[in-house]
Amino acid sequence: GYLGGYAGYAAAPAAYAAAPAAYAAPAYAAPAVVKTAYAAPAIVKAAAPAVDYYSYPKYAFEYGVNDPHTGDVKRQWEERDGDVVRGEYSLLEPDGTTRTVTYTADAHNGFNAVVHRSGPSAHPAPAPAVAVPAVAKYVAAAPAVVKSVGYGGYGYH
């Protein structure tokens, strides 16, 4: 036992209780299984989606640019009637030719474009080679070795 100044630890308890004679685990009951009947979903044929226009799509536009200062030369036109779109645009290529693209688009054929080039192709002559004078090689003298003068007052020699 404990021999210090607290008497509550000086001796063992006067009696011990005996272990229980038998142990019964709690009973477990599995939840009841409820059978649910399922029916196959009914097959419904979907109707083709109806085209619902707020207003019938119909437009036409055309524009062109001819800026000699920047060299920007182009034009375009397009028209739509329902689900059919037709149009054409052209632009001046850097080599001087004109590229023209004619296109159509509809629900049956999709988008189709035909590209044409017209006009003479003008390529600038290559710039003449410029002769660059050779740079003279720089030659430097090797550094001279100089014996150090000691610093006698500071203990360096």
Swiss-Prot record:
UniProt keyword list: Cuticle, Repeat
PROSITE patterns: CHIT_BIND_RR_1 (PS00233), CHIT_BIND_RR_2 (PS51155)
Per-repeat ranges for Sequence: 11-14, 18-21, 24-27, 29-32, 39-42, 47-50, 141-144
Coiled-coil portions: none
Limits of the Chitin-binding type R&R domain: 56-127
GO cellular component: extracellular matrix; extracellular space
Gene Ontology MF term list: structural constituent of cuticle
Domain-level remarks: The tetrapeptide (A-A-P-[AV]) repeats found throughout the protein are also present in many proteins constituting the protective envelope of other species.
Function: Component of the cuticle of migratory locust which contains more than 100 different structural proteins.
Matches recorded under PANTHER family: CUTICULAR PROTEIN 62BB, ISOFORM A (PTHR12236:SF75), STRUCTURAL CONTITUENT OF CUTICLE (PTHR12236)
Name this polypeptide is given: Cuticle protein 19
Organism of provenance: Locusta migratoria (Migratory locust)
